[in-house]
């Protein structure tokens, strides 16, 4: 990717060239959400920790490889966010920062629209890609993690358990599968590289791994350790 050339140039002459800026546009996983709980008002809430989001680990890896290069990360993740919202806030949250690379990751919330929502999802992704590609920024589509395939016994709170049951159906009925495939089709039509971590999670499931245990909230937020899989996969693509 062109980003590598910028990293090399800055590393070779860090006093005369700019650092690099990577923007990550997505949902709660991008924002840095982990465990969920019911607060004192009876509302669902989540624990936030940006330092353990995938882009934090990516920045750490790049800083290890290019210690003289400032790596600026724009966290444009939004809990509960969908691609439509991402398209609407693209300029405000991403493009005005003039990023060198934009990583786009949606689908976990979008799939709540069922198969009937696929066309709208695809159109929102097109709006996002159109906006990015009008600039000098490169773009990567990052496919999401699997959601829970069962309701874990640790989910004792009725409201959270009910959410887990709904999400499980979207995963096991192939709804999220369909959204991931549609996203890949749209990205491929634009010639946008695809970092297919969803396929890697699928391989883990096929290998007998209980992927529900790899989710911090046992629903849809990966553990910090699994966010490192996103980071390592993105690093491999960036360096390719």
Where are the regions a protein language model picked out?
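Alpha-helical cap/lid subdomain in secreted, periplasmic
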Residues: 4-6, 11-16, 56-72, 85-240
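Short glycine-rich His-centered loop
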Residues: 10-48
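Conserved long hydrophobic alpha-helices within structured protein cores
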Residues: 20-32, 49-55, 132, 136-144
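Glycine-rich beta-strand-to-loop/alpha-helix junction loops that act as flexible
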Residues: 25-28, 79, 106-108
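Short, electropositive, low-hydrophobicity segments enriched in small/polar residues
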Residues: 30-36, 81-85, 111
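Short catalytic helix/loop segments, enriched in acidic residues and glycine
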Residues: 40-62
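Short beta->alpha junction loops
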Residues: 74-82
